[in-house]
């Protein structure tokens, strides 16, 4: 028997789990716009208060994937997404976006899934636009971009149209809900490998196990202990790694890879233009913290993509991609390729 929204709400009030099939049903009601805004708001708030379980998040992500406009990629070897939940409040430049160019230059295929900044001063969509990339592509055009350049950017509103049915509720609530952690779990290109940054240490173990349930191959979920949703230079980074169906949790430190631990304060930006300047500086091989943190994150992504056998090997490949100018050339390549689809 299917659960009613009222029964689901009662379940959250009693701090009891909503089971997989029930969560599928409720999420489909929300995504179709068949649940009232009042009930939708109550349920997603109730879930947040009781703390969402791995099963509930996995079921919600399954439905969000169902409703997405998919990008069909022919060859998914060495295929990776580099994404963060955002919401870490660090206001740094777009490290994962910069890492995309380096990772692609070193031989991986990257399907980056992102949006405009909400909590940040500059989301991935904002900085890509500032670089001259056309972010408004159809799914088949994104697939062509991945095949041709090794990179594709999926602008979230183009791929998750059903999210409009919950957008007003989320905006008015103004608090984090399950939807804040679903984005990184719902890559429309179905990248089997992922480097995912999260905004809270508890999410490391949760999100990696959700990805395990969703059938992912090689995933590293990371949380910098200075609060960053990236691999950090300013502190140790918690890692949850899914590989060969098994989950391992551990800590890594910049010194493990011959990098100096330095504060991330110098990475803060006020807007997309400042982020663009810092991103290009890193890709132009200008010495400094920006280049080092991009190298560290791209190296980790190359390990996730199975291009490198370890993070250390990935960092070496990332260094070479930047020093050779290949990473910087990838920016111009993506701009040129996407501009042909300008409407």
From Swiss-Prot:
Q: Name one GO cellular component term.
A: cytosol
Entries under SUPFAM superfamilies matching the protein: Nucleoside phosphorylase/phosphoribosyltransferase catalytic domain (SSF52418), Nucleoside phosphorylase/phosphoribosyltransferase N-terminal domain (SSF47648)
Read off the Gene3D superfamilies from this record.
Nucleoside phosphorylase/phosphoribosyltransferase catalytic domain, Transferase, Pyrimidine Nucleoside Phosphorylase, Chain C
**Keywords from the UniProt entry:** Amino-acid biosynthesis, Aromatic amino acid biosynthesis, Glycosyltransferase, Magnesium, Metal-binding, Transferase, Tryptophan biosynthesis
Residues that hold Mg(2+) 1 according to the record: 96, 230
Gene name for this UniProt entry = trpD
Source domain of life: Bacteria
HAMAP family, A to Z: TrpD (MF_00211)
Q: Which GO terms describe its molecular function?
A: anthranilate phosphoribosyltransferase activity; magnesium ion binding
Q: Which residues bind 5-phospho-alpha-D-ribose 1-diphosphate?
A: 84, 87-88, 92, 94-97, 112-120, 124
Q: Which cofactor does it need?
A: Mg(2+)
So where does Mg(2+) 2 get bound?
A: 229-230
Q: What is its EC number?
A: 2.4.2.18
What this protein is called in its record is Anthranilate phosphoribosyltransferase
This enzyme catalyses: N-(5-phospho-beta-D-ribosyl)anthranilate + diphosphate = 5-phospho-alpha-D-ribose 1-diphosphate + anthranilate
One Pfam family cited in the UniProt record for this chain = Glycos_trans_3N
Q: What does the similarity note say? A: Belongs to the anthranilate phosphoribosyltransferase family.
Can you tell me which residues bind anthranilate 2? 170
Oligomeric and partner information: Homodimer.
